[in-house]
Each structure stands twice: as C-alpha cells, then as structure tokens.
C-alpha cells in the first residue's frame, strides 16, 4: 500500500511516498502552488497518485509547541479536504512540529548543503519526515 506524504505551504507542497510495504518514506519533489490564484498543484498531484498507485495521504499539521493549532492548520485541512474529494482516498493528518527544523538541521549537519540549495529541498525532506513519523507510529 503506497501512502503519499504532503507538507503543505503557501507557495509549495513537499511530496513524499512510502515504499509498497509502508516501511520507509522517500522524498519525491516539490510542487509550486499559489494560494492567491487558487493554483494548488492538483494536476501534478494526480499524475503522481496514478504513477505510484497511491491509496491514502498523510498531511502534516503545523501545530504550535503548546499543541494549539498554528496559523497554517486550517489551510492544511482545507487542502486535505480538496484532495479527499478529488481522489476519493482517505486523508490522515500527522503532527509536523519541528519537522522543518529537523530537516534544516539534517541538511546542514549531515549534508553540508548551502542555504540556497536547502530552500530547494527543504519541503520535500519535511514531507518525508512527516510521512516517516506517520509510518513509524501506525505500521
């Protein structure tokens, strides 16, 4: 069963996919979106869903450290509602606190990637961490 992980931002959506057995997550790509123009990358998402035969989604919920909803939680849930309606597949939500911080740390410490290059991969890595955390807790 393939699960797709998404890190939804206001300008990009980081995409990750699980292996067929649901053990590991791998970052796929970053889809550019524009909330103001109502461009949410659903066409590209549909291509990936078909290519990888996705059966469900996991979307990161950006909660605050005190467990209250952060300013982007509503946008993430709205995005999830749209893809649930478009694809008819279940959508789960995963607390994503500190995933972007962890992703930045990994890119700096382990990969020694420059700031400019980090911006190009950070959302993809955050999506991978969101999905891997979900897989670790549920499978």
Curated annotation (Swiss-Prot):
The keyword Lipid biosynthesis does not apply. One of its GO terms (biological process) is rRNA 5'-end processing. It comes from Streptococcus pyogenes serotype M1. It is found in: Cytoplasm. GO terms for cellular component: cytosol. Could be a nuclease involved in processing of the 5'-end of pre-16S rRNA. This is Putative pre-16S rRNA nuclease. The keyword Metal-binding does not apply. Belongs to the YqgF nuclease family. Its EC number is 3.1.-.-. GO terms for molecular function: nuclease activity. Its main location: cytoplasm. Keywords: Cytoplasm, Hydrolase, Nuclease, Ribosome biogenesis.
């Amino acid at each position: 069963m393939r699960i797709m992980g998404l890190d939804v931002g206001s300008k990009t959506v980081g995409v990750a996919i699980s292996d067929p057995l649901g053990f590991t997550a791998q970052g796929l790509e970053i889809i550019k979106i524009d909330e103001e123009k109502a461009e949410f990358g659903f066409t590209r998402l549909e291509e990936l869903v078909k290519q990888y035969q996705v059966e469900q989604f996991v979307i990161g919920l950006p909660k605050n450290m005190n467990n209250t909803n952060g300013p982007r939680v509503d946008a993430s849930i709205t995005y999830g509602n749209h893809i649930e309606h478009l694809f008819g597949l279940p959508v789960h939500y995963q607390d994503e606190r500190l995933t972007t911080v962890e992703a930045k740390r990994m890119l700096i410490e382990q990969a020694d990637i420059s700031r400019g290059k980090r911006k190009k991969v950070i959302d993809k890595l955050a999506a991978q961490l969101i999905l891997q955390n979900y897989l670790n807790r549920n499978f």
